[in-house]
Curated annotation (Swiss-Prot):
InterPro entries: MraZ, MraZ_C, MraZ_dom, MraZ_N, MraZ_sf, SpoVT-AbrB_dom, SpoVT-AbrB_sf. It comes from Mycobacterium ulcerans (strain Agy99). Transmembrane segments: none annotated. The gene is mraZ. This is Transcriptional regulator MraZ. It is found in: Cytoplasm, Nucleoid.
Amino acid sequence: MFLGTYTPKLDDKGRLTLPAKFRDALAGGLMVTKSQDHSLAVYPRSEFEQLARRASKAPRSNPEARAFLRNLAAGTDEQHPDSQGRITLSADHRRYAGLTKDCVVIGAVDYLEIWDAQAWHEYQQLHEENFSAASDEALGDIF
C-alpha cells in the first residue's frame, strides 16, 4: 500500500528518487503515466497491466473509451529504478506535470502520484476546505 507524502528533488537529468519504503514494491518495474490534475501516476507494472486490461475491454465503438485508451497507452512510460531508486522522467512527462526541481510524491493507496511542489500546494489549498464534504459525496457508505 502506498501512503504518505515525500519531497524528493528532480535532478538536472530528469531523475527522481523514489521513497525508499516503496522501492521493493516497484522493483519489478513500474509504469509512469499522465494522470488527472496535471500530475503523474506511478503504478507497479502488475497493477498497471490490470488497469490496461480493464480499459481495453471497453467497446471500441465508444469515442470516449478510444480516447482514454489512446491517451493511457501513449502517455505511459515503463521504468526500472536504478540502484539508488531513481527513475528518469521523460521530457514530455516533466512538461505535462510542470515539474521543477521541487517535487512531491504522494501515496494514493494502490499507486503513487508525482506533483510539482507548488502545484501540489495550490491543489491542497483549493481542495482542503472541501475534503470532508467531498469524502461524504464521493465515498458514500464506505466510511
